[in-house]
Amino acid sequence: MELTPREKDKLLLYTAALVAERRKARGLKLNYPEAMAYLSMEIVEGARDGRSVAELMAYGRTLLSRDDVMEGIPEMIPEVQVEATFPDGTKLVTVHNPIP
């Protein structure tokens, strides 16, 4: 199977997000890469589900709390920017202060 670089990136992100999701479900606090992967994939999947950019910007702030991540992680992630594919094309979704 031949994959484009973009497809490889999406698969890597999805794999990292699955690991983060499982660790979060077990009650472990997420580190920086896990938190970024988790937030990014939820946004990409939300776009796939048909949500709008505005909905995803608001939704992105509800995914993780300070209790879900290691100390200092919220300050390391002032915003998350993800390119997501919508029915009308690819758009950049920016979530400010994703871990309030």
UniProtKB/Swiss-Prot annotation:
| Keyword annotations | Cytoplasm, Hydrolase
Chief location category = cytoplasm
Which cysteines in this chain are paired by disulphide bridges? none
Enzyme Commission numbers on file: 3.5.1.5
Q: Which GO terms describe its biological process?
A: urea catabolic process
Q: What class of enzyme is it?
A: hydrolase
Q: Does the keyword NADP apply?
A: no
Alphabetically, the GO molecular function entries are: nickel cation binding; urease activity
Q: Which InterPro entries match?
A: Urease_gamma, Urease_gamma/gamma-beta_su, Urease_gamma_sf, Urease_subunit
- Pathway membership, UniProt: Nitrogen metabolism; urea degradation; CO(2) and NH(3) from urea (urease route): step 1/1
Residue runs in coiled coils: none
Question: What parts of the sequence cross the membrane?
Answer: none
Q: Name one GO cellular component term.
A: cytoplasm
Q: Where in the cell is it found?
A: Cytoplasm
Q: Which domain of life is it from?
A: Bacteria
Oligomeric state and interaction partners are given as: Heterotrimer of UreA (gamma), UreB (beta) and UreC (alpha) subunits. Three heterotrimers associate to form the active enzyme.
- Protein name in UniProt: Urease subunit gamma
Query: What organism does the UniProt record list as the source?
Result: Hahella chejuensis (strain KCTC 2396)
| Gene name linked to the record | ureA
